[in-house]
């Protein structure tokens, strides 16, 4: 058993133990590549003895020379990131404007090799920095953003466009710097395909909470008459709207509401101008299914009451412990029809999982 297989087996065993006592079917397991799976990476820039290099630090340790890990390459990151790392630091080292007070760097790449680099500084960025950064951007064929306290300078664009094939169709996603996106594109594609298989034959309308940039929304829209998706982040809502239009999808509407706010609107406790302004009338929908992909804290108690009203629940979780706690409630009214482990974060303790629940027939 190699290192990757061993760590994955540990995650399977953990889930079986955690969900013992619940009637959960055999876990479907979706593996990750064991190298070059992360589309995002971030490093400190360490300056020492006239040299600078990429660095990380021992987990739980204060950032210092004692805890420093030099990173001339980073096998977890995409091949595009690894190819760019030495070129970027070599070019930046030749320019005092780029080199001085350069504190950290963030890479955001795509499967096609498109690259956005955010260079973070402990100094004010001026016109001289912009000239040097524009030359770097052109030389390396990348997009560059400069950040410092109170400053964000976008030289070309602040996003990349990822393309993921799901079933027989390509979906194009604008991924904006600083916004959440699934870091492991290969496993993300498997998650999308699993969710689509779970949705097959359900019909009716879909409600999605916590939709982000529309990652799941776009492919799932093919399986429902109408989709209403909610998201609180303005940046994510903007990206989701762009993604919907770019993919020529006509049956999705986005409501800029938190899950808690939508619960208030859906139950009639409160009216929201944002819904009216978006032309969204909740009584126009006949929801058969709810899709949720909540933050690590899981679903709050009031939203959980809302979720339990739907015939079908597709639940993607980034925290199996809060999923287990939520299932203790949801399995009072629903049965678990499918369960999946997605190894989105190899060689870490983090586990991404998904379940399909169907309402019990009384």
Swiss-Prot record:
Briefly state the protein's biological role: Dual-specificity methyltransferase that catalyzes the formation of 5-methyluridine at position 54 (m5U54) in all tRNAs, and that of position 341 (m5U341) in tmRNA (transfer-mRNA).
What keywords were assigned to this record? Methyltransferase, S-adenosyl-L-methionine, Transferase, tRNA processing
Q: Which reaction does it catalyse?
A: uridine(54) in tRNA + S-adenosyl-L-methionine = 5-methyluridine(54) in tRNA + S-adenosyl-L-homocysteine + H(+); uridine(341) in tmRNA + S-adenosyl-L-methionine = 5-methyluridine(341) in tmRNA + S-adenosyl-L-homocysteine + H(+)
Q: Which residues form the active site?
A: 318 (nucleophile), 352 (proton acceptor)
Q: Where does S-adenosyl-L-methionine bind?
A: 182, 210, 215, 231, 293
Q: Name one GO biological process term.
A: tRNA methylation
| Sequence similarity | Belongs to the class I-like SAM-binding methyltransferase superfamily. RNA M5U methyltransferase family. TrmA subfamily.
Keyword set includes RNA-binding: no
Principal EC category: transferase
An example of a Gene Ontology cellular component annotation for this protein is: cytosol
Q: Pfam families annotated for this entry? A: tRNA_U5-meth_tr (PF05958)
* Molecular functions per Gene Ontology: rRNA binding; tRNA (uracil(54)-C5)-methyltransferase activity, S-adenosyl methionine-dependent; tRNA binding
Mind telling me which residue stretches traverse the membrane in this protein?
Answer: none
Q: According to the UniProt entry, what is the EC number of this protein?
A: 2.1.1.-, 2.1.1.35
Q: In the UniProt record, what gene is named as encoding this protein?
A: trmA
Record's keyword annotation contains Transferase: yes
According to UniProt, the name of this protein is: tRNA/tmRNA (uracil-C(5))-methyltransferase
PROSITE patterns, per database record: SAM_MT_RNA_M5U (PS51687), TRMA_1 (PS01230)
């Amino acid at each position: 058993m190699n290192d990757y297989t061993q760590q994955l087996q540990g995650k399977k065993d953990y889930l079986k133990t955690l969900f013992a006592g619940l009637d959960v079917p055999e876990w479907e397991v979706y593996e990750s590549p064991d190298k070059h799976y992360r589309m995002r990476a971030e490093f400190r820039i360490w300056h020492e003895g006239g040299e600078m290099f990429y660095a990380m630090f021992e987990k739980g340790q204060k950032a210092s020379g004692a805890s420093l890990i030099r990173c001339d390459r980073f096998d977890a990151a995409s091949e595009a990131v690894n190819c760019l790392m030495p070129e970027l630091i070599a070019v930046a080292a030749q320019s005092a404007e780029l080199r001085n007070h350069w504190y950290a760097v963030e890479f955001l790449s795509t499967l096609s090799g498109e690259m956005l680099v955010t260079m973070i500084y402990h100094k004010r960025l001026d016109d001289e920095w912009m000239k040097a950064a524009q030359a770097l951007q052109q030389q390396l064929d990348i997009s560059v953003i400069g950040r410092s306290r109170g400053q964000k300078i976008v030289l070309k664009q602040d996003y990349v466009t990822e393309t993921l094939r799901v079933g027989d169709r390509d979906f194009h996603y604008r991924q904006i710097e600083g916004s959440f996106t699934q870091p492991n594109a290969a496993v993300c594609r498997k998650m999308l395909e699993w969710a689509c298989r779970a949705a097959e034959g359900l019909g009716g309308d879909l409600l999605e909470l916590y939709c982000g940039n529309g990652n799941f929304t776009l492919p799932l829209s093919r399986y429902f008459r109408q989709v209403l998706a909610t998201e609180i982040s303005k940046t994510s809502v903007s990206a989701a709207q762009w993604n919907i239009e770019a993919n020529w999808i006509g049956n999705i509407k986005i409501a800029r509401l938190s899950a808690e706010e939508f619960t208030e609107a859906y139950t009639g406790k409160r009216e929201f101008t944002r819904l009216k302004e978006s032309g969204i009338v909740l009584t126009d929908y006949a929801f058969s299914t709810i899709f949720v992909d909540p933050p690590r804290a899981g679903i709050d108690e009031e939203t959980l009451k809302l979720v339990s009203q739907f015939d079908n629940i597709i639940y993607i979780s980034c925290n199996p412990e809060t999923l287990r706690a939520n299932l203790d409630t949801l399995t009072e009214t629903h049965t678990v029809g499918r369960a999946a482990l997605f190894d989105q974060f190899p060689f870490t303790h983090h586990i991404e999982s998904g379940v399909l629940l169907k309402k019990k027939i009384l």
